[in-house]
Amino acid sequence: MLFSPMKKTFDSIELVVKDIHRGKMVIVVDDADRENEGDLIMAAQSVTPAAVNFMAKFGRGLICVPAAAERLQQLGIDRMVQQNRESFRTDFHVSVDAARSITTGISAADRARTIKIMAEPAAVPDDLVQPGHVFPLRARPGGVLQRAGHTEAAVDLATLAACRPVGILCEIMNDDGTMARLPQLLKFAKKHRLKICTIADLIEHRRTREKLVERVETVKLPTDYGDFDLHLYRSKVDGQHHLALVHGDVAGRGKVLVRVHSECLTGDVFGSRRCDCGSQLHQAMRQVAGAGRGVIVYMRQEGRGIGLAPKIKAYKLQEQGYDTVEANQKLGYEMDLREYGLGAQILVDLGLKTIRLLTNNPKKIVGLEGYGLKIVEQVPIRVKPNPHNERYLKTKRQKMGHLL
């Protein structure tokens, strides 16, 4: 779960932003079910050789420079690889050094100069050389509201502090080389007099001030399971449309039954028996209608986020003996690329606060919390297996942690 219940342990986002604005360093802690790590973070425009040396000496992790996509494009810095297979899809770009006035590029002073250039609005591609000793990271549009990672947190904090949208981060490791976890991070913050916050609190801070989805239209939708209101939403990040089916009065109600369902054309529309998606969708509609009120958020995340064409290619690999996870990995994808931040914002827009979540996937709970939603119960969604999807369901249980 996210660390937000321990708010008294952490500094407010307002205090953290003030320190970033003053050129100071802070510690940002992420989700215990994600990396469960803390990073040193500061605005790139405030970098000094002493700051780089502190990160290298006391942080001990990889010093990286998160930036908005537009900034990296302006500097002519491309992705390191075309197919990102890193565990948390950290978007590494080609490493760089300053083109002039450095030695080997690795010293604290050299790296500080390179980072300074990356934050300069007037900098151009010729001001940098590739490869180098500084590692740029691309932050997702929408920041932590789109992806709850340190990359996005660094850029968001810089932006909130009225700095340029370029940050610096470095993971914090213990003396023995292991990753520092929350107890060690709290001691580290106290020892070095650094503010410490969580990504969950940053999400909450932004969520209460910004919204990345907008409701476009609402229509009546009579179905075999009852009458629903169908709400059309548009993402302000990428223009993608998502849907919310609402049964009954849900705004301001407590413990509303909710299903966040990712699009599956083959299962939802064609009734494919290779998966359980279509059966789960119809069962969710049945349960929501039976409860008297509830919401089904229909997210356009075909094929666990890889898209329709790659999913069909993954099906072909499954016919050759690969399971669903192995097929994704064979194509260069992680086993699950879905994200639930926009789905959470849709639920908040509908007036929900406490929900009963229809899911067999514990990771979905992590993806929704931190956006002002409290999940008071995980409700299993049961559908009967068939001979065509038995192996698929076994893989979901054994490799993806689904509670089946």
Give residue ranges: language-model regions.
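Catalytic domains of riboflavin
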Residues: 2-404
